[in-house]
Amino acid sequence: MNAQELRDKTPDELRDQLAALKKEAFNLRFQQATGQLENTARMRSVRRDVARVATILTEKAAAAAATE
């Protein structure tokens, strides 16, 4: 997912996506701890996606506060 696609989404959609990504990250950590994780690179990409979504949410909140 790229940042431009995320900027086109509403804050509610971004919050939903952030929750889903955090849940996936939790499941991946659990799989790694039990030795079931096959694609370890997925953990890195999910962690970066979480950061990307959180950054866009912060940008949108700052923009909304600036217009008020």
From Swiss-Prot:
The record's GO CC annotations read:
cytosolic large ribosomal subunit
Q: Does the keyword Cell wall biogenesis/degradation apply?
A: no
Q: Which GO terms describe its molecular function?
A: structural constituent of ribosome
Q: Which InterPro entries match?
A: Ribosomal_protein_uL29, Ribosomal_uL29, Ribosomal_uL29_CS, Ribosomal_uL29_sf
Which keywords are on file for this protein? Answer: Ribonucleoprotein, Ribosomal protein
Give GO BP annotations, semicolon-separated.
translation
Q: Which family does it belong to?
A: Belongs to the universal ribosomal protein uL29 family.
Write down the PANTHER family for this protein, in alphabetical order.
Answer: 60S RIBOSOMAL PROTEIN L35/50S RIBOSOMAL PROTEIN L29, LARGE RIBOSOMAL SUBUNIT PROTEIN UL29C
The UniProt entry, under NCBIfam families, shows:
L29
Name listed for the protein in its UniProt record: Large ribosomal subunit protein uL29
Name the source organism. Dinoroseobacter shibae (strain DSM 16493 / NCIMB 14021 / DFL 12)
